[in-house]
């Protein structure tokens, strides 16, 4: 299995999107690329941790490619809005692709360049190495999938 990590607003709906993909074998929501170890949801929502709400997933590259996952990521949100998706506002809702290897990095950069052609405004999505991923509290895991 291969890991991928994406941030595209509230992690509940992002997780649900990827849970429905054939070839994705595991998802978990959490916090990444911040400055606080083991942050809580409340701390992340304060905007003082630097963390993004993100989804870390495991997938079978024989069944779904990283490029296909990137396509879903881009389709899920407006990557031109900085630190905002819909009514959710704050740095924790930023758009991000957090790569786990050089191949993912290169594919992410290429997909961002291709995606930019669709927009007048610049894409604000950050592409960074995957940092430490802190799983969110149990009540946030598979939140929308449970309803």
Curated annotation (Swiss-Prot):
The keyword Electron transport does not apply. Pfam families: PMSR. One of its GO terms (molecular function) is L-methionine-(S)-S-oxide reductase activity. InterPro entries: Met_Sox_Rdtase_MsrA_dom, Met_Sox_Rdtase_MsrA_sf, MsrA_MetSO_reductase. It comes from the Eukaryota. It catalyses: L-methionyl-[protein] + [thioredoxin]-disulfide + H2O = L-methionyl-(S)-S-oxide-[protein] + [thioredoxin]-dithiol; [thioredoxin]-disulfide + L-methionine + H2O = L-methionine (S)-S-oxide + [thioredoxin]-dithiol. The keyword Oxidoreductase applies. Residues 1-23 form the signal peptide. Its EC number is 1.8.4.11. One of its GO terms (cellular component) is cytoplasm. It is an enzyme of class 1 (oxidoreductase). Keywords: Oxidoreductase, Signal. GO terms for biological process: cellular response to oxidative stress. Has an important function as a repair enzyme for proteins that have been inactivated by oxidation. Catalyzes the reversible oxidation-reduction of methionine sulfoxide in proteins to methionine. Belongs to the MsrA Met sulfoxide reductase family. This is Peptide methionine sulfoxide reductase. It comes from Dictyostelium discoideum. The gene is msrA.
């Amino acid at each position: 299995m291969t890991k991928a990590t994406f941030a595209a607003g509230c992690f509940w709906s992002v997780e649900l999107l990827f849970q429905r993909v054939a070839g994705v074998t595991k998802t978990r929501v959490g916090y990444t690329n911040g400055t606080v170890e083991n942050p809580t949801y409340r701390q992340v929502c304060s905007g003082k941790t630097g963390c993004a709400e993100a989804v870390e997933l495991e997938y079978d590259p024989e069944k779904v490619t990283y490029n296909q996952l990137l396509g879903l990521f881009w389709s899920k949100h407006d990557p031109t809005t900085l630190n905002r998706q819909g009514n959710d506002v704050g740095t924790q809702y930023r758009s991000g692709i957090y790569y786990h290897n050089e191949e993912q990095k290169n594919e992410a950069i290429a997909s961002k360049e291709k995606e930019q052609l669709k927009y007048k405004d610049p894409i604000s999505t950050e592409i960074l190495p995957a940092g430490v991923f802190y799983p969110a509290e149990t009540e946030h895991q598979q939140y929308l999938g449970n309803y």
